Amino acid sequence: MSEVAPDTEDTLPPYEGILLSEVRLVRSSEDAEAAMAALLACDAIGFDTESKPTFRKGEVSTGPHLVQLASDSHAYLFQVGANAASSPAAAVLHAVLESPAIVKVGFGLGDDLRRLRAKLGIETRNVIDLATALRAVQGTSERNAWGAKTAVARFFGRRLQKSRRITTTNWATPRLSEQQILYAADDAHVALRIYRHWHEHFPAAAAGAAANAIRAANAAPRAAKPVQPG
């Protein structure tokens, strides 16, 4: 692994991230068809979701409200509203996330997987939670030892800027801001970049940890799919 020490991460130059021109908002049937073709051609994709935050006691999240999938060259954002199950995006999400041929990589994906299952009935397959996989390689049980910020610092020598102000914005809004779009796209795209770097520079460790992570994710209890109204 990189020699960057955790206490120097905040002094590193910023991670530049994905460009706005490389982000696709999937809204129409044509957008969905293009996204499906591009993503199904990938061997691995970056993956994350965003949900509108809940602030009141007892309030139940209706997320995810945004699903982000990234190839090496682009990020695709799918807005998941109340009628998402019948939207053009739903078919893409089912086909890509349930495909056993595509590895899905991200950080801290437990809630994302549960919410996708509850809202859309998606059983995501071949998942690598990089926070778990990288922690296993390092031989530490420290829960937050390998978040995206730490991985970017140690692998790329850059500082990943995570704005809490953007994190807690309304992800259910029909019109996302440019800041929201870039933040969300980066979350998925940087996960794939980290996965590629890990596989290229530490192939044996990556292969073993990835196999264990996929096995654990696929063995997780599966809830019954929600019944859609007739």
Spans of features found by a protein language model:
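Conserved DEDDh/DEDDy metal-dependent 3′-5′ exonuclease domain
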Residues: 24-29, 33, 40-44, 53-176, ...
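N-terminal accessory regions of nucleic-acid-interacting proteins
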Residues: 1-45, 83, 130, 202-230
